[in-house]
Each structure stands twice: as C-alpha cells, then as structure tokens.
C-alpha cells in the first residue's frame, strides 16, 4: 500500500467541525485541499493558522481528506497592519478561485515568496498586483498586455477597455473604465515606477477578477476599508 507523503502547505481557512475537530483548507503545491484535523485542540491545532509554513500528510482518496500528520516547517510570516489585511486578501482569493486539488506548484512558490516580502515590509501594491496577475495566468484567465484583441501592438497614446473573456480592445471614444496604452505597456514590463502604473494595475486586476469572483463581496476587502 502506498504510504502518504508529507508536502509543504499553508492554511487558507479553518473552522470547527463536529466536537473536537477542525475542517481545514490547505494550499499546497498540489492545489487547494480540504481535510479534517482531528483533536484540533491539541498540538496540531495550534499550527492551524494563516501564514505558517507547514508540512502536512494527508490521507484518503475522497475530496475530503484526513490530516495524518502536521508539523511546522519554519518561522511564520509575521504580518501586521496593512500587510496582514493583504495576506488575508491573498488567502481569500485562493479560497474563492482555486479549484480543488488542481496542482499549482509555481503559484504556491509565488505565494510563499509574497508572504515573506509582506513580512519584510516591502511595498504592498506591487506585491498584490503581481500575485493577482500570476493567479490569473495559472488559472488560464490572463490576457496580453502588449497586444490588443486584434493582435495589434498596444499604442502608448491609445485608449483601451478590457473584455474579460478576450483581452484589451482599442476604443476611440472616452468612456468610464478605460486604460491608456502607456500604462498598459508599463504593466507589461512590471514597471511600477511609471506614472499611473500602480493605479491602472489595481483597476485592471479588479476588472479582470470581478467576473470570476462573482457578486459576493470579499470579506478581506471590507475589513481593509474599515481598518
């Protein structure tokens, strides 16, 4: 019989389950996995919190696994203030958008590095925008930033709107929600110092993610507004 193998993991979300157990959503290189942690008030339960690098051994073949073993694998990313809200935002995006058990090894690595950067006090906006874009790419929802839907190069003096299911479309009449070409070209190069780049990136990612997130508001976004 094949023995379960430990794998790196982070806790995305947990809640009480039955009398002494917890239902935990983990993010691992193999994707988002839900599992039951029994005796959650013991040693293992103390590790079930966000931003702690873990090694988890999961048992079972159904979609709902059982935690066989749970160990700390390093120092938790100590997030506070806006960095904490940002980390919770990343977790909520992963909970809402990741399909169950779809391997995402590169996204997992990007997530771990983003947590480290947040803990180190790096500027938040570039980190969040980079992670959002990587998430869109890995889920197959990304689009070109240097070419429009007609495969024409983005022009610095052009105006564009996002068609979420297709890409950027050039328009010639001013309307709400447009992006100028110079901003888009800066985003294609991840040039966060370019004038307007960060604000444009935030608007663009919000538009791109909205259709996949649906109408339910993000709790982490509401918490950030009320801080």
From Swiss-Prot:
User: Which of UniProt's keywords are assigned here?
Assistant: DNA damage, DNA recombination, DNA repair
Q: What's the domain of life for this entry?
A: Bacteria
Q: Which residues form a coiled coil?
A: none
Sorted alphabetically, the Gene Ontology cellular component annotations on this record are: bacterial nucleoid
Single Gene Ontology BP term? double-strand break repair
Record's PANTHER family?
DNA REPAIR PROTEIN RECO (PTHR33991:SF1)
Per the entry, what this protein does is:
Involved in DNA repair and RecF pathway recombination.
Spell out the family assignment given in the record's similarity comment: Belongs to the RecO family.
Q: Which HAMAP family match?
A: RecO
Protein name per UniProt:
DNA repair protein RecO
Q: Which source organism?
A: Pseudomonas putida (strain W619)
Gene behind the chain: recO
């Amino acid at each position: 019989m094949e023995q379960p193998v430990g794998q790196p993991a982070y806790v995305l979300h947990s809640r009480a389950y039955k009398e002494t157990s917890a239902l935990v959503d983990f993010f691992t290189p193999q994707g988002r996995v839900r599992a039951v942690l029994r005796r959650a008030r013991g040693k293992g339960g103390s590790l079930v919190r966000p931003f702690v690098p873990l090694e988890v051994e999961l048992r079972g073949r159904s979609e709902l696994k059982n935690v066989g073993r749970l160990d700390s694998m390093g120092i938790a990313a100590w997030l506070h203030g806006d960095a904490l809200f940002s980390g919770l935002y990343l977790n909520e995006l992963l909970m809402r958008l990741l399909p169950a058990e779809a391997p995402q090894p590169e996204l997992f690595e990007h997530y771990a590095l983003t947590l480290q950067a947040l803990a180190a006090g790096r500027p938040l906006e570039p980190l969040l925008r980079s992670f959002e874009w990587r998430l869109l790419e890995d889920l197959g929802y990304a689009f070109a930033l240097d070419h429009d839907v007609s495969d024409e190069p983005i022009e610095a003096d052009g105006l564009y709107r996002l068609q979420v299911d297709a890409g950027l479309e050039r328009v010639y009449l001013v309307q709400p929600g447009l992006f100028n070409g110079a901003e888009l070209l800066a985003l294609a190069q991840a040039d966060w110092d370019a004038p307007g780049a960060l604000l444009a990136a935030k608007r663009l990612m919000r538009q791109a993610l909205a259709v996949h997130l649906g109408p339910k508001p993000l709790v982490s976004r509401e918490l950030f507004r009320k801080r």
